[in-house]
Swiss-Prot record:
The modification 3-methylthioaspartic acid is found at D89. One of its GO terms (molecular function) is rRNA binding. It comes from the Bacteria. This is Small ribosomal subunit protein uS12. Part of the 30S ribosomal subunit. Contacts proteins S8 and S17. May interact with IF1 in the 30S initiation complex.
Length: 124
């Protein structure tokens, strides 16, 4: 515990908050090019084949980004838009690809929660 005199001399050190998405560099989204598209398995209690892509961003970073929704059309050299948001059961995956933007198509036949998957409203 600091004494009153020590606080007068030096003051308290302000802790800086570390960003959870450093590659975005304070931008809401970033554009990038897929360098690898692959599937990986999640951490212990869960079991699945999660779709992930490695993306080289315009900011110079290379990051792993999760591809949400059922089915996708991404391959190497696809241009994608990524946003922040980690995937809890995939270590090292701190970004999501934005569906329905640039080369990433929206999810087909999506009826509910469409805006999150870039799906257009179906004709009545």
């Amino acid at each position: 515990m600091a004494t009153t005199n020590q606080l007068i001399r030096k003051g308290r050190k302000v802790l800086k908050e570390k960003s959870g998405v450093p590659a975005l560099q304070a931008c809401p989204q970033r554009r990038g090019v897929c360098t690898r598209v692959y599937t990986t398995t999640p951490k212990k209690p869960n079991s699945a084949m999660r779709k992930v892509c490695r993306v080289r961003l315009t900011s110079g970073y290379e990051v792993s980004s999760y591809i949400g929704g059922e089915g996708h059309n991404l391959q190497e050299h696809s241009v994608v838009l990524i946003r922040g948001g980690r995937v809890k059961d995939l270590p090292g995956v701190r970004y999501h690809t934005v569906r329905g933007a640039l080369d990433c198509a929206g999810v087909k036949d999506r009826k509910q929660g469409r805006s999150k998957y870039g799906a257009k409203k179906p004709k009545a």
